[in-house]
Amino acid sequence: MNGLYLTLPIFLPLVGGLVSYLIRFPSTRSRHLFYGVLICLTSAATWLSILRCGSESFQLLRFTEELTLTLRMDGASRLFAGLAATLWPFTMLYAFDYMSHEKHLSMFWSFFTVSFGVTLGVAFAGNMMTMYLFYELLTLATLPLVMQPMSTTARKAGVKYAVYSM
């Protein structure tokens, strides 16, 4: 059961954010409703994981005997995931208004949501390989947020961000 508690908060926003990029929302209200529900569900799933998950590890993938993708809930991951799960919905509410005048909102909201899942992956990382993988994925998931206006200046900033982060 720990596997579900640890993977659902990560994969719900990952899949939801990527699929939502393909959806053409008929109105701003419907877009906000979709992302609001998705992010609040992810926060609820995260808090459920924090409260119900034991300290056992869950192995997602085994490459070799020593190299595995492992998720684990411990004290630090509870703190970090709890902060993310609490603050992300408030950030979303702020961004609804802050980003209202911008273009490329489908890209912004998709990657904003994906970033939530990847952040939780960093929180639940059970070993250094898993943390490194999710850290690099976080760099890639936030790159479109840095480049969001898609202006020449934003693209140059995105290249710098990618070079410094990788």
Which residues fall in each region the model found?
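Generic detector of intrinsically disordered, low-complexity, polar/charged segments
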Residues: 13-14, 33, 155, 165
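Short conserved micro-motifs on helix faces and helix-strand junctions that flank
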Residues: 10, 71-72, 124, 133
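Alpha-helical multi-pass transmembrane bundles of energy-transducing inner-membrane proteins
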Residues: 27, 107-114, 118-166
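Membrane-embedded alpha-helical segments of multi-pass membrane proteins
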Residues: 11-15, 41, 134-141
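Transmembrane helix-loop-helix hairpins at membrane boundaries of multipass inner-membrane proteins
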Residues: 1-8, 15-110
